[in-house]
């Protein structure tokens, strides 16, 4: 689905507008790539009162991932009688494994046999990650002189007045600079 984010502000310095618009898009793309999300065409837009990014055909769900957790070698995890040692028990406790079934979790790691547990993480809907992705992308913008306005504790180059966040046909609401994102943008004053 298509992703659209727009940040509406008071007048931005003309020297920073285009650079910030492009960097916002780059930062968002970088965050999506970290999550192994695919997308197609991207577009940055910036005017003195808004910074925005549009990303076409963004994946809706993060891919499933498998994390391999290696434990101690079998010579350390089991004593000479085949009973669990403290290292083997710690591995079983860490991953909540049945101590009697640890033989299922033995794999060859190059030169030796070790305990090994594979964690499968199911993909999550990308909408649940928008808050952290957007905050990270904004935080990485190189802003030397930040302003604080009103009573909130947020800082940005100029006071933020609105934010738009859409994914596909849906409006997504996240908290950003004491605003809730919506689907309404503003034109000239």
Predicted features by range, described:
Residues 1-189:
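Long, basic N-terminal domains or extensions that often function
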């Amino acid at each position: 689905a298509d992703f659209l984010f727009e940040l509406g502000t008071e007048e931005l310095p003309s020297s920073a507008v285009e650079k910030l618009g492009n960097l916002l898009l780059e930062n968002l793309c970088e965050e999506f790539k970290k999550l192994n999300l695919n997308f197609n065409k991207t577009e940055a837009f910036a005017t003195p009162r808004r910074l925005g990014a549009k990303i076409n055909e963004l994946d809706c769900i993060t891919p499933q991932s498998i994390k391999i957790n290696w434990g101690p070698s079998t010579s350390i995890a089991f004593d000479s009688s085949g009973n669990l040692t403290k290292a083997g028990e710690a591995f079983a406790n860490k991953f909540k494994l049945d101590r009697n079934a640890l033989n299922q979790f033995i794999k060859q790691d190059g030169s030796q046999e070790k305990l090994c547990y594979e964690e499968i993480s199911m993909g999550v809907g990308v909408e649940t990650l928008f808050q952290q992705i957007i905050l990270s992308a904004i935080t990485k913008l190189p802003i030397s002189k930040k302003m604080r306005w009103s009573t909130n504790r947020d800082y940005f180059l100029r006071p933020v007045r609105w934010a738009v966040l859409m994914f596909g046909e849906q409006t997504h609401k996240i908290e950003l600079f004491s605003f809730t994102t919506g689907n309404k943008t503003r034109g000239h004053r």
